């Protein structure tokens, strides 16, 4: 490997420039305020976790984990997601708290990427976990909260696609009969490679009726009618139970007034292997990839010896900023620069103090430290000159 240039960053890492940071902070502040109004408590977990605990139970592939050794020889990982660390936290520091628990977070996560992938290896997530409630009310609450948080951030055009792990698994296993063959079909669905899915189904040694059932799965998208259509493809109790749960969930979302933002997608398969029930993805205007996702994971907590049903969601902040693209709420803090000479220093400082007391963002800049006044002035909305022995506000003495 060649020596990196001084300006290079590790692959997949990004710098955050001032404008982007302000926008991101404003969005996160708005969403956090909404989440707090729903009774969720913000928490933080360490950037580093033990590989043998969080690393092993995380649904992120092992080759995507950033690993390192501590001084005692223990293998550590940079946290690859937030759900597993929160499960560890609930089973340890919060073990004496009664369920249900409503927790929220805003944290960076880390996943190693291939050089040609073009994906970030570090990105910020904001999300919630509702732990200890297995009802449709809990599923509906987190989806309704996600919708409310996106709206609070300023996103006006988006849809949330809702599926169910139990339905997909029940149908595939009922038709193809073994986990290996079902997993191959699930992979096509996860990649949204519907052409590959169709071609693979055609190649299977199945009856015409069973092939038709697998093909018709791809059409199960839309409103409540999609649920009714899905009933005709399923014969197992697990599949019927999944549809009953989705019907109840829709009723809960209607009571929140959130049904206009959702649609059913029975083909939906997410990459997190610990999901056990309802799953969902949110798509923003003009954005071709999901900017948020979540679902029910009723078995993860048992790996930390404190079994509990749970559901939650996470929002990719970088993708949300991209989806907003002009709908971003202004934070109202445009900067003014006071450019002063030495003899007007005290006057400039007093003026800056008054403006800051009124909530204005003010930069104090000594004229002696500037080589190009015109170039510097272009960085600010307004420039006040305190230069010379008399006059200000653009009047030089």
Curated annotation (Swiss-Prot):
Biological or metabolic pathway of the protein: Amino-acid biosynthesis; L-histidine biosynthesis; L-histidine from 5-phospho-alpha-D-ribose 1-diphosphate: step 1/9
InterPro entries: aa-tRNA-synth_II, aa-tRNA-synth_II/BPL/LPL, HisRS-like_core, HisRS/HisZ, HisZ, HisZ-C
Primary localization: cytoplasm
Gene Ontology molecular function: catalytic activity, acting on a protein; histidine-tRNA ligase activity; transferase activity
Keywords: Amino-acid biosynthesis, Cytoplasm, Histidine biosynthesis
Coiled-coil intervals: none
Gene3D superfamilies the UniProt entry points to: 3.40.50.12590, Bira Bifunctional Protein, Domain 2 (3.30.930.10)
GO biological process, one term: L-histidine biosynthetic process
Example of a GO cellular component annotation carried by this entry: cytoplasm
Intracellular or extracellular location(s): Cytoplasm
NCBIfam families (alphabetical): hisZ_biosyn_reg, PRK12292.2-4
HAMAP family in the record: HisZ (MF_00125)
Family: Belongs to the class-II aminoacyl-tRNA synthetase family. HisZ subfamily.
Quaternary data: Heteromultimer composed of HisG and HisZ subunits.
Function of the protein: Required for the first step of histidine biosynthesis. May allow the feedback regulation of ATP phosphoribosyltransferase activity by histidine.
Name of this chain's protein: ATP phosphoribosyltransferase regulatory subunit
Organism expressing this protein natively: Halalkalibacterium halodurans (strain ATCC BAA-125 / DSM 18197 / FERM 7344 / JCM 9153 / C-125)
The encoding gene: hisZ
């Amino acid at each position: 490997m060649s020596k990196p240039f001084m300006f290079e960053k590790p692959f997949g890492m990004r710098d955050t420039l001032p404008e982007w940071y302000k926008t991101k902070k404003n969005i996160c502040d708005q969403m956090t305020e909404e989440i707090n109004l729903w009774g969720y408590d913000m928490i933080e977990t360490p950037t580093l976790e033990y590989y043998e605990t969080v690393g092993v139970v995380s649904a992120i592939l092992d080759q995507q984990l950033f690993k390192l050794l501590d001084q005692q020889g223990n293998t550590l990982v940079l946290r690859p997601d937030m759900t597993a660390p929160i499960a560890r936290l609930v089973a340890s520091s919060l073990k004496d708290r009664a369920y249900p628990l409503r927790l929220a977070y805003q944290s960076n996560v880390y996943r190693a990427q291939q050089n040609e992938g073009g994906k970030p290896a570090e990105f910020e997530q904001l999300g919630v976990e509702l732990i200890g409630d297995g009802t449709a009310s809990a599923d509906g609450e987190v989806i309704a909260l996600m919708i409310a948080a996106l709206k609070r951030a300023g996103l006006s055009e988006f849809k949330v696609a809702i599926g169910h792990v139990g339905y997909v698994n029940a149908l595939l296993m009922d038709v193809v009969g073994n986990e290996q063959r079902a997993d191959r079909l699930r992979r096509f669905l996860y990649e949204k490679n519907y052409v590959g899915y169709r071609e693979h189904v055609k190649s299977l040694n199945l009856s015409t009726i069973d092939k038709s059932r697998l093909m018709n799965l791809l059409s199960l998208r839309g409103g409540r009618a999609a649920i009714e259509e899905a009933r005709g493809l399923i014969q197992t109790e697990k599949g019927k139970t999944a549809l009953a749960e989705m019907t109840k969930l829709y009723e809960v979302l209607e009571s929140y007034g959130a049904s206009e933002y959702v649609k059913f997608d029975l083909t939906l398969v997410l990459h997190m292997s610990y999901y056990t029930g309802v799953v969902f993805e949110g798509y923003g205007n003009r954005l071709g990839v999901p900017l948020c996702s979540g679902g029910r994971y009723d078995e993860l907590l048992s790996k930390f010896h404190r079994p509990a049903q749970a559901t939650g969601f996470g929002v990719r902040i970088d993708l949300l900023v991209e989806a907003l693209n002009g709908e971003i709420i202004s934070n109202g803090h445009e900067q003014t620069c006071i450019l002063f000479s030495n003899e007007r220093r005290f006057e400039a400082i007093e003026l800056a103090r008054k403006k800051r007391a009124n909530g204005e963002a003010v930069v104090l800049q000594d004229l002696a430290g500037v080589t190009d006044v015109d170039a510097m002035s272009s960085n600010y909305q307004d420039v006040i000159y305190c230069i010379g022995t008399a006059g200000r506000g653009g009047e030089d003495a």
